[in-house]
Structures are given as C-alpha cells and as structure tokens.
C-alpha cells in the first residue's frame, strides 16, 4: 500500500485530495501548520504532522512513497510569503524528497507558470515563484508530475477535464474538486510520471489522462 505525503493538507485542494485518498483506503501523511484544521478528518490511515513550512520539515517524508505539494501562501499574503512558501518551501520539499528516494513527486502549480514574463499583473511574483519551483523539480532526479490548473472555482466535480487551454481566458477555469480528483487519479497511476500539463474543466474523462 502506498503512503502519500500531502504538503498543504489543510488547504482546499490538499484537504479534498486527502479525503479522496483515504476513501480509497490509502495511507496519507498530512503536513499542516495547524492540525486543528483537520479536525473533521478521522481515519486510522491518516497521520498528521504539524510543522511550519518555513522550518525544517524533512521528517515528514520518512516512510512515504510519493508526495503531493499543494501548499500555497494564499492570496492575502505579501511577496515575502510567496517567496518563502511557493518557492522556497517547494524547493526544500523537492530536496527532501530526493534524499528520501521518493518515487513520485506531484506539484500543484498554476497556469502561467511556464512563462511569467507574459503576465503583467499582480500575479507575476506568484507565477515567478511557481516557475522556479517547477524548474527545480524538473531538474531533479525525481519522477514528477506538474499540474498547472486554470482559475480555481468552487464548482462540484464534473469529473471531466481538458489539458488544452481554452481560447477565452474566461473559460480557463477548473474546479478545485476536479483538481483533487485528478491528483488522486495520478497518485494511483504509476505511468503518470515526468509530465507537465495545464488543467481545465472540459469534456474528457479524468481517466483519459
């Protein structure tokens, strides 16, 4: 049975993914800053590790087979937290994973992280951080999957997606539940390694990935 470390397990996507993996009777190590945010998760398959990502969190990787990095500084923080969490904590996670010989590292990135220079909005620092974190993973020795969701919504999971960017930016959206279901699917498909793709709501079944 695989054991998955979810970094940022108290965030919306991280928590949804934790629940989905647990529902499939898989072991989950949930890395969070405040374990009280997971009070509604109760399973013998769940291990909660409480640790600030700005500190050393390498111990959380012990005994894990794969990692999902779903942490983020949040939209209400400044550029300092963007650097420390979205870039530096992600880089540290990749380094820790290499030391622990993790079999598969899944990074939740963002649309636009491929080319932050093309963006001229307040999102640019965030996308630069995501770009650098993604590049560090791609240049590592790890098997990886980088998922770059479009604009996140709170719609229910349609279980149908697209990896082709829509012509209209207004259509470049994906529900958080769809993202969580994609991560769960990938975590159970060993062939899904060393791939980078954007993710949107669409018409293709998740199993088409």
Question: Positions of the model-derived regions?
Answer:
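Substrate-positioning beta->alpha
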Residues: 90, 170-185, 195
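Active-site beta-alpha turn of Rossmann-fold NAD(P)-dependent dehydrogenases/reductases
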Residues: 71, 106-109, 150, 200
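Glycine/proline-rich active-site loop of Rossmann-fold NAD(P)-dependent oxidoreductases
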Residues: 156-161, 186-195
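Flexible, glycine-rich beta-alpha linker
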Residues: 148-164
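Core catalytic loop region at the nicotinamide-binding pocket of NAD(P)H-dependent oxidoreductases
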Residues: 189-209
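Conserved Rossmann-fold NAD(P)-dependent oxidoreductase catalytic core, especially the SDR/UDP-sugar
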Residues: 27-29, 35, 77, 81, ...
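N-terminal Rossmann NAD(P)H-binding glycine-rich loop of SDR-like oxidoreductase domains
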Residues: 4-24
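NAD(P)H-binding glycine-rich loop region in Rossmannoid oxidoreductase-like domains
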Residues: 5, 36-92, 96-99, 187-188
